[in-house]
């Protein structure tokens, strides 16, 4: 006989945990199904371990690039990759403990194992059947590996976090967040790093000002950027090294190859066909604005929904809003996917909210868009030989010059933009920005002093 719940969340990542906890807080009988470590991609092989590695890279840059001009004679005896990994994993372990504690306090039933649908109201885990009035699919995605000869000799972005030793020479293939971040970390920590992108630049969906500045810094400081580089074949040499051959005839010999070319939805292993839930050709689940699929009682949040934003806070927010609607009598609760702030932990970091210049002109008309920009050298680097640019932009629309896009790249931009996101969600105009007294000397003051 099947065990019945009010709510079953398939996937113990950020979205599933957030939704399960919120539903349980309102008295729902909830099951959370996860086969691996709680926290999903973000906590285990994504945002969290990546940010720890990035902090390590920042410390390396401080010592190697900037300390001397601040008067410090730093004698770096070496870098212990294994120690950083040990510290990183200990931190992740504490997050796992926190999840266990909070889920336990909320009386969420955590079921370990892989879930498969039996029908639209029933799932099977380890041979046991569970039913629910409401079922959330939040299984996330997996890294994609290209279909070329020798691709198996490389590792994916998840495998980067399994590296027990620091590689001496690395090729990172990809043009998105993950590729740029991994390449930046490895380069800063001392690995000879090559970043290969298919087109003319990485991060092509970002505002051109951001892209141009990032490429400028890469050209000056590294990692080595290879544009118009399409992988053709990977050959494993007799000495164990790998040679990446490109369609343009060029090649690069490295010790490690990391594929970071994107992700695909992990919907192929849950027997979704038994439910009738609609997906697109790539396996992404189709949902409406309330996270509902075409099958009553089945919902979806996170990286596997069609047209979604693949960011942890988005999945968390969407999962919580869904539980508010289902279990807290808030029929209109839903995720607002407009003006979502995002950061790339590159070198230097990038922050962006809203529309690029081109997107704003397409939406509002070129004559109704005004752009303000600022460029300077961050004070932190300005007193050193390794000066690094900082660029900022406001994209404004309409007679009132509502701020519809905010973009920045430079020292500490990652910590600047959260508050501006609040202002933009409230409909802030350029005049509102101008009315704020600047904090001096900071980089963030540029956002409220542009002319």
PLM features: residue spans?
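Beta1/beta-strand and adjacent pyrophosphate-binding region of the FAD-binding site
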Residues: 2-13, 166-176
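Glycine-rich flavin
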Residues: 2-5, 21-28, 33-166, 199-203, ...
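FAD-site-proximal beta/loop scaffold in flavoenzymes
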Residues: 152-168, 251-329
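Glycine-rich dinucleotide-binding loop and its adjacent helix/turn
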Residues: 47, 139-192, 224-225, 273-275, ...
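Short hydrophobic core segments
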Residues: 8-10, 115, 130-140, 172-173, ...
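Flexible, glycine-rich terminal cap/loop adjacent to redox cofactors
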Residues: 8-15, 21-36, 41, 48, ...
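A Rossmann-like FAD-binding core segment of flavoenzymes
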Residues: 109-112, 116-124, 189-289, 330, ...
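A conserved FAD-binding loop/helix module that cradles the flavin
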Residues: 213, 301-361, 432-435, 440-451
């Amino acid at each position: 006989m099947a065990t019945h719940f009010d709510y079953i969340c398939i996937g113990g990542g950020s979205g599933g945990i957030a939704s399960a906890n919120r539903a349980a807080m309102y008295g729902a009988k909830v099951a959370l199904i996860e086969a691996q470590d709680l926290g999903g991609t973000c906590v285990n092989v994504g945002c969290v371990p990546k940010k720890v590695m990035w902090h390590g890279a920042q410390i390396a840059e401080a010592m190697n690039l900037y300390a001397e001009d601040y008067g410090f004679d730093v004698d770096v005896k070496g870098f212990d990759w294994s120690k950083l990994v040990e510290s990183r994993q200990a931190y992740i372990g504490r997050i796992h403990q926190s999840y266990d504690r909070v889920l336990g306090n909320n009386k969420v039933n955590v079921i370990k194992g892989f879930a498969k649908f039996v029908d639209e109201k029933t799932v099977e885990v380890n041979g046991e059947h569970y039913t629910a009035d409401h079922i959330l699919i939040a299984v996330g995605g997996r890294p994609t590996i290209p279909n070329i000869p020798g691709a198996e000799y490389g590792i994916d972005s998840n495998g980067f976090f399994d590296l027990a030793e620091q590689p001496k020479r690395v090729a990172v293939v990809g043009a998105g967040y993950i590729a740029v971040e991994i390449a930046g970390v490895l380069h800063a920590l001392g690995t000879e790093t090559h970043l290969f992108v298919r087109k003319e630049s990485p991060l092509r969906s970002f505002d051109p000002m951001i892209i141009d500045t990032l490429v400028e810094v890469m050209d000056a400081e590294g990692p080595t950027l290879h544009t118009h580089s399409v992988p053709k074949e990977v050959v494993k040499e007799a000495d164990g090294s790998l040679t990446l051959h490109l369609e343009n005839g060029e090649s690069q010999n490295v010790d490690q190859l990391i594929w970071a070319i994107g992700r695909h939805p992990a919907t192929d292993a849950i027997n979704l066909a038994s439910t009738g839930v609609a997906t697109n050709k790539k396996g992404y689940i189709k949902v409406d604005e309330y996270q509902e699929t075409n099958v009553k009682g089945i919902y979806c949040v996170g990286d596997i929904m069609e047209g979604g934003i693949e960011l942890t806070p988005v999945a968390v927010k969407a999962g919580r809003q869904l539980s508010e609607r289902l279990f807290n009598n808030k029929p209109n609760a839903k995720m607002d996917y407009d003006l979502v702030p995002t950061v790339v932990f590159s070198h230097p970091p990038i922050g962006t909210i809203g529309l690029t210049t081109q997107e704003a002109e397409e939406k509002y008309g070129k004559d109704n868009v005004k752009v303000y920009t600022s460029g300077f050298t961050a004070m932190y680097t300005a007193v050193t030989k390794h000066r690094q640019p900082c660029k900022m932009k406001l994209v404004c629309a309409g007679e009132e010059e509502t701020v519809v896009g905010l973009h920045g790249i430079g020292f500490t931009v990652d910590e600047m933009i959260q508050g501006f996101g609040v202002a933009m969600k409230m409909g802030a105009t350029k005049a509102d920005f101008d009315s704020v007294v600047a904090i001096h000397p900071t980089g963030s003051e540029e956002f409220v002093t542009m002319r």
